[in-house]
Amino acid sequence: LHAERLGVDIHVMLADGAPIRNITEAVQNAHLQVEAVVGSPIAAGYACLSPEERDLGVALVEFGAEVTNVSVYASGMLLGLVTIPMGSGDVTDAIASAFGIRRFQAERLKCVHGSAIASPSDHREMIPVNAPGDEMTGPIARHADDKNRIPRAELISVITEQLARLMEEVSRALKSLGFTGQRG
């Protein structure tokens, strides 16, 4: 073979070796073989995107509890990745802070009654801070009525405010990765 130019596109991912060895050993102790160790953004890309999407070009936003990964694929491969140090846990923390409640209560409110889209009916709906069976235990939430219920509209407002901050960061990340595709 003869060539004037040789090129290669590679992605180098750094990881602490100890956790990888621990996971590999745990899998092997279960009498299974580890075929490969793959970075989370690459695994998410293969799990969530079709080969055609990865080929044509797409952005993938992966929301985690502590971080949000923004990755861009084109020509079938990962072109770039930005990790934002914000995630769904920040939404939970904002709810806990806004209403002066415990984190587990905030997580339950987010999962059971939360939404990323406000609705006019939210202003009429009062939601219980405590889980069924736990009524009148723990502190009364800020802005709550005598039955420790809060307006759903206030919960949605806290959630959408946090998500707006996160979306600003996602938008910045996409710009830094050169992604100019249509949104939606």
Residue ranges and their predicted role:
Residues 60-67, 73-76, 85-89, 184:
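A short acidic Gly-Thr/Ser loop motif
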Residues 81-83:
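Residue-level detector of high-confidence beta-strand sites
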Residues 91-103:
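Catalytic P-loop NTP-binding/switch module of NTPases
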Residues 171-183:
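Phosphate/pyrophosphate-binding loops at sites that engage ATP/ADP/AMP, CoA/4′-phosphopantetheine
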Residues 1-59, 78-79, 88, 102-103, ...:
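Nucleotide/phosphate-binding catalytic cleft detector across ATP-hydrolyzing
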Residues 162-171:
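A general structural motif
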